[in-house]
A protein has these predicted regions:
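Short, aromatic- and cysteine-enriched interfacial helices/patches
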Residues: 1-2, 27
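N-terminal ligand-binding lobe of clamshell/alpha-beta domains
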Residues: 26-247
Length: 247
């Protein structure tokens, strides 16, 4: 009798274990289907010109222009971390040319950055559209300031190859422009939550500074700043009052 009860208890335990496994499997299957459905859902992105760009899925590889502007590259590296070199299909050399100290630190952590194909720059007409098409990225991020020349010289070729263009803007030096650029890049790469965290971090700190400065009731001194990328041998390299930090 005791052996029979023990055997029945054993069967009950096995039965419960099987049921638990089936429930877990069904739940896992349901969750997988949910994630798959989300990944297959078209992604609508509003870029900095107000255009709506639709991606079938998050971009896996992209081309970057004006990397030396700092903003887009820093946003991408904050979004992707050590995977940054894997997602950049090609870029210009302005980051390493104009911000050599930053480039040195980034390549020390991610040596693969130095192996990313150089595709030239739209701004100085070295942009190699044929090379970009051959690299087959999903997206190309273009600064708003390059829009006219890009649309004249290269965009038709990108459109024909099915490469989506997303305009961003880190040069207006406006909080809203930075926020929208971070959001657009994050959405394009399927990193919306992380992009929201980055945007909040940035917004909190900029707002904190602006709030403090707005409360200073003293004469504001005149300040002259230069762009240091040409070294101490050159002077007069600065921005006008209607561009970047010259605002």
């Amino acid at each position: 009798m005791f052996k029979q009860k023990k055997f029945m208890a054993y069967l009950a335990t096995v039965f419960l274990l099987i049921v638990s496994m089936l429930i877990a499997a069904c739940a896992g299957s349901s969750e997988t289907k949910k994630v798959t459905a989300q990944n297959n859902k078209p992604i609508d992105i509003t870029d900095l010109t107000g255009r709506t760009v639709t991606l079938k899925k998050p971009a896996e590889r992209f081309v970057l222009q004006w990397s030396g502007a700092g903003g887009p590259f820093f946003t991408i590296s904050a979004l992707m971390g050590k995977d940054t070199p894997k997602v950049i299909a090609g870029m210009d050399t302005s980051l390493q040319d104009y911000r050599a100290d930053m480039w040195k630190h980034f390549t020390a952590e991610m040596p693969e950055l130095a192996k990313i194909p150089v595709v030239g720059t739209v701004g100085d007409k070295t942009f190699n559209a044929e090379q970009v098409v051959a690299l087959n990225p999903d997206v190309i991020f273009i600064p708003v300031d390059l829009k006219d020349q890009y649309e004249s010289d290269a965009k038709p070729k990108m459109d024909a190859a099915g490469i989506q263009t997303i305009y961003i803007d880190y040069h207006a030096e406006k909080l809203e422009s930075h926020q929208k650029s971070i959001e657009a890049i994050g959405k394009a790469l399927g990193k919306e939550e992380r992009a929201a965290e980055i945007s909040k971090f940035y917004t909190d700190r900029v707002t904190r500074v602006l709030d403090r400065v707005s409360k200073i009731n003293k004469p504001k001194p005149t300040v002259y700043l230069e762009v240091g990328m040409n070294g101490p041998e050159e002077f007069g390299n600065s921005f006008s009052s209607n561009y970047s930090w010259g605002h």
